[in-house]
Amino acid sequence: MARIAGVNIPNHAHAVIGLQAIFGVGQTRAQQICAAASVNPSTKVKDLTEAEMEALRDQVAKFTVEGDLRREITMSIKRLMDMGCYRGFRHRRGLPCRGQRTRTNARTRKGPRKAIAGKK
């Protein structure tokens, strides 16, 4: 198994699909990385030469991925919460912060329903 940015890339996958195993690399960015490294996107990872793997590693290193990206996202949310703005307040409460309704729905963000004693 090849390792790029601390992630094991599956050998059986095509290069463009294998790169998407890295957090922060989607379809478009994976295609850009393959093009910049002059690697055929449909080549299987196990068939890549060491020079091609090194070129892919160099291209991936130019982007913010994996731990650095996760840390950046966490720090952005923490900054909003420390600032005390509306979005930070919603993050702190565990509610949707992009204007969705919460009277009904929003179960993903709010978690499972909490039982309330019914009227008797």
Curated annotation (Swiss-Prot):
One of its GO terms (cellular component) is cytosol. One of its GO terms (molecular function) is rRNA binding. The keyword Cell division does not apply. Keywords: Ribonucleoprotein, Ribosomal protein, RNA-binding, rRNA-binding, tRNA-binding. The keyword Ribonucleoprotein applies. Residues 96-120 are annotated as: Disordered. GO terms for biological process: translation. It holds the Pfam family Ribosomal_S13. Belongs to the universal ribosomal protein uS13 family. NCBIfam families: uS13_bact (TIGR03631). Located at the top of the head of the 30S subunit, it contacts several helices of the 16S rRNA. In the 70S ribosome it contacts the 23S rRNA (bridge B1a) and protein L5 of the 50S subunit (bridge B1b), connecting the 2 subunits; these bridges are implicated in subunit movement. Contacts the tRNAs in the A and P-sites. Part of the 30S ribosomal subunit. Forms a loose heterodimer with protein S19. Forms two bridges to the 50S subunit in the 70S ribosome. This is Small ribosomal subunit protein uS13. It comes from Chromobacterium violaceum (strain ATCC 12472 / DSM 30191 / JCM 1249 / CCUG 213 / NBRC 12614 / NCIMB 9131 / NCTC 9757 / MK).
